[in-house]
C-alpha cells in the first residue's frame, strides 16, 4: 500500500481535495490519498473536514494515515469524499515549523552545538530544546534578532529526498525524525538557504518571509545540558509585542516616567529600596539592642538559674538568634525571647547548664509548633499563642 503520510509535507499548500475512502471503521477513516498531516515530529495533527464532518484527530498507524471524525460518517469504503484542511491552522503550523528551523539555526550558531533536544507546536507558543555539552544559555533578544533577520531576508526554503547514508555522513544535517523515518533508505531534507539543513517530515513554507515576525517569549534551562527557547510567530508574535508594550506603558505611567526610561527608573528604585532596607535593618538592630539591655535588668530565678524572658518586635528569629547570646555572657543563665514573624516564634539561649532544646520543647508542648537546635541555642516556631502569653508561661507564679 502507498504510504499516504508524506503528501502533506510534499504539497503543504493543498487545502481542498477529493479522495476515495480505503477503509471506514466507526469514526476512523483511511483515504487512498490525503493531504491531512498526522501528528508527529512535534507538529500537531491537521484540522478540517471530510464531507463536512469535523476531523478531530489525525494519526499515523501501521503506515497509514487515520482520520478520526467527530461523528460517524455516512460514507463507506469505496466512496469518494470531499476533504478540506483548515487553512488557518495549517498555515500556522507551516510558519511555526519553518520558524523552528530558523530559531534552531540561530541557536546552533550561538551555542556551537548540533544537539536537538525536542520540539513542540502549541496554539500560543512553540517550544524548541537544544542539547548542550554543559552549562549554556542564550540571550532571548539575540535569538529574536537573528531569527527576524532571516525572515526579512526572504530566504528560500526547499525540501527534497536524500540517501539516508549520505545524509547521515553530513555533519551539517540535523535529524528530527521518528524511528521509522530514520531507518528508511531515504530521508526528507528541509533546507533554508545558507542557514539550516535538517532531516524533517513536517510541513513548511516556501520562503522565510511567510513566517512573519518571531517573538521570543522565554529562554530557560529545564534540565541538565538543555536550553529551551519558547517563541511565537505571525499574528501571535504581534499580539505578544503589543501586550509587552501595553505592560511597559502601564509600568511607565505608574512610575511617572517614559517607557524608554523604565530601566534606569527601575535601577534607581532598586537602589533606593536597598538603601531603605539597610537603614531599616540598622534601626531594627538598634531597637533589638536597646530591648536586650532593658530585659537584662529584669531577671528572675527559676530552678536555681537566672532567667531573662521577654518579647521583641520588628525582627525575625534569625536576627534574634544572632544577638541573644550576648545576654548569657553575664546577665543571665537562660534567655528566652518571643516575637512574631508570620507566626509566634521563640528563641532560647543558655550558658550550657540548661539545655535550650528542653526549654523549646516545654514551650511547644504547651503551645504547639516545633523546633530545636543546639544545647546552647535553639528556636521554636508556629506557636499557637501570642508572644506575651508564651513569656508569661515561663515566669514563676
Residue ranges and their predicted role:
Residues 1-397:
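A glycine- and charged-residue-rich anion-binding loop/surface
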Amino acid at each position: 500500500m502507498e504510504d499516504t503520510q508524506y503528501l502533506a509535507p510534499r504539497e503543504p499548500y493543498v487545502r481542498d481535495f477529493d479522495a476515495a475512502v480505503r477503509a471506514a471503521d466507526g469514526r476512523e477513516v483511511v483515504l487512498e490519498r490525503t493531504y491531512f498531516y498526522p501528528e508527529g515530529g512535534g507538529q500537531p495533527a491537521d484540522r478540517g473536514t471530510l464531507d463536512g464532518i469535523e476531523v478531530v484527530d489525525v494519526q499515523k498507524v501501521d503506515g497509514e494515515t487515520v482520520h478520526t471524525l467527530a461523528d460517524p460518517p455516512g460514507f463507506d469504503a469505496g466512496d469518494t469524499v470531499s476533504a478540506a484542511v483548515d487553512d488557518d491552522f495549517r498555515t500556522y503550523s507551516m510558519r511555526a515549523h519553518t520558524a523552528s528551523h530558523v530559531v534552531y539555526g540561530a541557536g546552533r550558531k550561538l551555542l556551537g552545538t548540533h544537539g536537538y533536544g525536542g520540539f513542540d507546536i502549541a496554539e500560543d507558543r512553540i517550544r524548541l530544546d537544544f542539547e548542550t555539552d554543559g552549562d549554556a544559555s542564550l540571550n532571548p533578544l539575540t535569538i529574536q534578532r537573528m531569527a527576524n533577520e532571516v525572515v526579512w531576508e526572504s530566504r528560500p526554503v526547499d525540501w527534497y529526498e536524500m540517501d539516508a547514508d549520505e545524509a547521515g555522513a553530513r555533519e551539517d544535517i540535523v535529524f528530527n525524525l521518528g524511528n521509522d523515518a530514520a531507518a528508511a533508505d531515504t530521508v526528507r531534507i528541509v533546507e533554508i538557504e545558507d542557514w539550516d539543513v535538517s532531516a524533517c517530515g513536517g510541513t513548511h513554507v516556501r520562503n522565510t518571509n511567510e513566517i512573519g515576525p518571531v517573538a521570543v517569549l522565554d529562554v530557560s534551562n529545564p534540565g541538565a545540558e538543555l536550553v529551551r527557547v519558547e517563541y511565537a510567530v505571525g499574528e501571535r508574535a504581534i499580539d505578544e509585542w503589543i501586550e509587552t508594550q501595553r505592560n511597559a506603558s502601564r509600568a511607565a505611567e505608574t512610575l511617572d516616567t517614559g517607557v524608554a526610561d523604565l530601566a534606569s527608573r527601575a535601577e534607581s528604585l532598586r537602589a533606593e529600596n536597598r538603601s531603605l532596607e539597610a537603614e531599616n535593618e540598622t534601626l531594627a538592630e538598634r531597637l533589638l539592642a536597646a530591648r536586650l539591655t532593658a530585659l537584662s535588668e529584669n531577671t528572675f530565678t527559676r530552678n536555681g538559674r537566672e532567667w531573662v524572658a521577654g518579647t521583641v518586635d520588628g525582627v525575625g528569629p534569625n536576627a534574634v538568634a544572632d544577638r541573644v547570646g550576648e545576654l548569657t555572657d553575664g546577665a543571665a543563665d537562660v534567655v528566652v525571647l518571643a516575637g512574631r514573624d508570620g507566626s509566634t516564634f521563640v528563641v532560647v539561649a543558655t550558658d550550657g547548664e540548661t539545655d535550650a532544646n528542653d526549654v523549646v520543647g516545654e514551650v511547644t508542648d504547651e503551645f504547639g509548633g516545633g523546633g530545636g537546635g543546639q544545647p546552647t541555642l535553639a528556636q521554636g516556631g508556629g506557636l499557637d499563642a501570642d508572644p506575651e502569653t508564651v513569656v508569661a508561661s515561663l515566669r514563676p507564679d
